[in-house]
Amino acid sequence: MNLGHWNFLLALISLQTFFNASAQISTVNNSSKGSNNSNIFHEDTFNSTSIDVLDASIHSTLVVPQTYSTEAATISGARFATSVPVQSPVDNPLDPADCSQREKYRKQPVATPSSRLRKCCPHGENLNIYRENQSDSMCDNGLLSFEPTIISAVLFDNCIEDLEVETTLDYDIGNPCNSSLLYDDKDDVFFVLQDGSLLIIDKFGNESYTVKEHYCLDIDKSGHLFAFTCVTQVEEQIAFAKVVFVAVLMLISMPCLLLVSYLHMTLRLLRNLHGLSLSLMSLCLASGYFVHSVVHIYGIPNQGFIGYVIQFCILSYFFWYLCICFNVLLNVWYKLPCCIQCSKSWATFNFACYAVFAFSGPATIVALTVQKGLPGMPSYFLQGLTESIRDSQRYFIPPVSTILFLSFLLNIISFFGFQRISGYAKAEKNIQERKCLFDQQKYEDVKKDAKCVSLLGIIMVVSWLLEIITFYSGSNSNYLILCDMVNGLQGVWVLLIFLVVRRRRTIILRWWYDRGSHEIEGTELQALSNSPT
């Protein structure tokens, strides 16, 4: 074989080697390009205006009950409100492209009728974060709208899949925590899941996420979103057995109040302006106690309409008491000194004014409560352990305290009115001729009514002070149940005060005797013969 053949053979071998190397390089390039097409994340998927989550591939570990944390997150095909650092596919080459290869998480967020989004401040108010460490906050009137992102998602072992279903949730108002941690949207992204729990995704660093069930979410006046998550869960406030016991006392008070209301509406001698006001006052308290006790005994949800009905009834009770105190003052300072004899039409007009005031006042307060999104349940059976519970009573405790204070002032003014008018009774014995005849019997009746009203006022003030002590006390001491017992027995106090006094007892016994069920003794007949008809 000559030299030319060898040269030809070497050329063929070199050409074959070149083609093989070119084929291998082409295969590697195609493989690399395909890998980049399936794993690369475009910058435009993380922009400042997007709000939906498509899916997330995340490594998950359980932290504490009802709290789940994930680390080493690889977010694929997701869009968030701000830029989130994306992990290179070279770092995690085995991560799947979606959640289909992941095991579904054992506990899933499920939307229920009771699912709520927890807002820190009432409607129309925003957070005011103050102090350097941002450890304290309060709610101020604000104009910024609160529109958090709500998603429906499925939790997998290392992945979150957005179902892209439009979801809406009602709001619960207030911070439910004894102590809390503060998150803000500078470092985290917040989403609310379909069951009302909060999904927190870390923008920077370890690319982790957390799900919290006990939290509240709101914005400050600059538009930044903040989340307060509970460090410790709220303890049970009052044992169920104690709640049932006090609720039973309320049910015992109810027939006493209904009896007072019925007798003052039925008996002609008791059916005057004072008696009708007392009747409606007792009826309002009986209605509130009945609904309140049934709700707690049977565990009926007290959010929404039922809570507002109870709030309206209890507030009406205090407003009617204020009307009764004002009626005593009106008699002492105007009707008795001026010898005013009220006609039936004037008494009807006077009662209508009382009714408008006693019902429109509570209705206005309930309307404000609804507007702010606060629960309407009164503070009975509650302890203000958290900010949300304390804030829920802003339209119950301050109004009732104000009404009782005004009633106390009216009773004091009425007392000085009695001191002033007592001179008329003494002067009547010495003066033979008077321009107008002073009604001594009416004076005695008003005086007895004033004594009963003042005694009831003392009981109401004492029971209300005990209620405030119970609400703001942070302990579960046994003496707190005694405070609630005094409140639960208010119907019994009303019965004893307004029906056991001698003149009313005599009138009731006479009414009973007319039906053949009682024999009136001589002293009672003598008292009746001296009383006006």
Curated annotation (Swiss-Prot):
Bilayer-spanning residue ranges: 243-263, 280-300, 304-324, 348-368, 396-416, 452-472, 481-501
One MF annotation (Gene Ontology) recorded for this entry: G protein-coupled receptor activity
Keywords, alphabetical: Cell membrane, Disulfide bond, G-protein coupled receptor, Glycoprotein, Membrane, Receptor, Signal, Transducer, Transmembrane, Transmembrane helix
Record region (Disordered): 86-108
Disulfide bonds: C120-C216
A Gene Ontology biological process term: G protein-coupled receptor signaling pathway
Organism domain of life: Eukaryota
Subcellular location: Cell membrane
Residue stretches in coiled coil: none
Residues bearing glycans: N20, N29, N30, N36, N47, N133, N178, N206
Mode of membrane association: Multi-pass membrane protein
Signal peptide residue numbers: 1-23
GO cellular component, one term: plasma membrane
Ranges of the Cytoplasmic topological domain: 264-279, 325-347, 417-451, 502-533
Record topological domains on the Extracellular side: 24-242, 301-303, 369-395, 473-480
Family: Belongs to the G-protein coupled receptor 2 family. Mth subfamily.
Protein's UniProt name: Probable G-protein coupled receptor Mth-like 14
Biological source species: Drosophila melanogaster (Fruit fly)
Lineage: Eukaryota, Metazoa, Ecdysozoa, Arthropoda, Hexapoda
Encoding gene per record: mthl14
